């Protein structure tokens, strides 16, 4: 689905691989500790690979809903309770960092779950995620830090098999 309503088809389970450069840019702007990180929508591992290219000392726990992906745990991250994650969590009880490019329609649930299980939560989301009256009370209690990527990441660069057309995202700011 396109932000401007041009009719692009949504990819199943919002599976849009994340390019390495926005992750690298984000890590330049945000200081995050080494330790145990969780990637709850890991897909093919693009974010894990990108982080590992520029940061040392990170141990990973990966999760994805799609059983075809090489994740440590398969299932819907937004429904996992502490018991499911406990065996994968560090001894101190929280992951050091939760980082992902969540399915946009589930972004709020991913953020909320991340806040429950990690000391730092990093989400690659369109800036317009912060808009909306329904998020106002949540934002007052959980005011996020924001790093804006001035170059537009494209998470949809693929050829549609039905039309043969290249498609991509069209929002102009990510944070």
Where in this protein do the model-derived segments appear?
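Class I S-adenosyl-L-methionine-dependent methyltransferase catalytic core
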Residues: 1-175
């Amino acid at each position: 689905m396109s932000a401007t309503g041009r009719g692009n088809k949504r990819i199943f389970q919002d599976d849009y691989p994340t390019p390495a450069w926005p992750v690298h840019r984000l890590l330049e702007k945000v200081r995050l500790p080494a330790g145990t990180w969780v990637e709850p929508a890991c897909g093919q591992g693009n974010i894990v690979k990108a982080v590992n290219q520029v940061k040392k000392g990170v141990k990973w726990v990966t999760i994805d809903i799609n059983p075809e992906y090489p994740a440590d745990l398969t299932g819907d991250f937004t429904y996992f309770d502490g018991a499911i994650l406990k065996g994968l969590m560090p001894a101190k009880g929280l992951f050091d960092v939760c980082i992902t490019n969540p399915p946009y329609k589930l972004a709020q649930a991913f953020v909320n779950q991340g806040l429950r299980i990690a000391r730092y939560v990093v989400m690659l989301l369109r800036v317009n995620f912060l808009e909306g009256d329904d998020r106002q009370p949540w934002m007052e209690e959980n005011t996020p830090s924001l790093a804006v990527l001035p170059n537009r990441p494209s998470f949809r660069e693929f050829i549609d098999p039905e039309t043969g057309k290249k498609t991509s995202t069209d929002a102009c700011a990510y944070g």
